[in-house]
Amino acid sequence: MNKKSKKMLVAILLGFLLVTTIYNNWRLNEMAGSNPGILNVGFDVDDTILFSRDVFLNIPEDKRNPTDYGWVNMQDEKLSLFIEPTVELIKYFKNNGHNVFLITARSGENGDYLAKFLSDGLGSDITKDENLFFCPKESINGVRYTTKHYQMKKLNLNLFYGDADTDMIAALKANVHPVRIVRHNESIEQYGNNYFGNVKDGEKEKNPFQMNDLKIFYSKSVGIYGESI
């Protein structure tokens, strides 16, 4: 190969490398959204932001089957408490310029009451259908399944914090990294059908783990679905 051909080959290779680099940078920016370095972070509400056990334990009998979420969404001011470490985490993300979205399995009747309560407690504007989304479970052949993954995909989330197995599953289905918020012991004891969390109901197919098992998971900071804890 003569000197001129070598120079031409080098020029072609450099041009190809430049185009490839530009394309890869464009793809990275596309994956990160319009603001590279800015995360889209999602949070569940019940037992993640709010200790809302007393709301659900006090549902009147005539509003239980099916659950009257119009009633539930109006009770948080009286019966729910904010989980302060989660509140501080949300403030950290927002103060550092990240986008925060809240996704709940409650249905949206009277959802503005919940939005106002969350706004007051988090110190930032929470608005239904803007950064607070209601994604009730879908019933198929009598079994209720999460629908949160649809909203997670729309929001292009990077992280999702939740307490329930269904939160972890929804995040994985949406290709979002799941982070487990460990439920308060009183919540574990009173309600919830987590494979991970139900350790006080005996050894059953739906409750395969005991408290010692959970302590091992906690010590490793990894849950049964590979989620962070």
Features from the language model and the residues they span:
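C-terminal cap/substrate-recognition subdomain and adjoining C-terminal extension
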Residues: H98, S107-I229
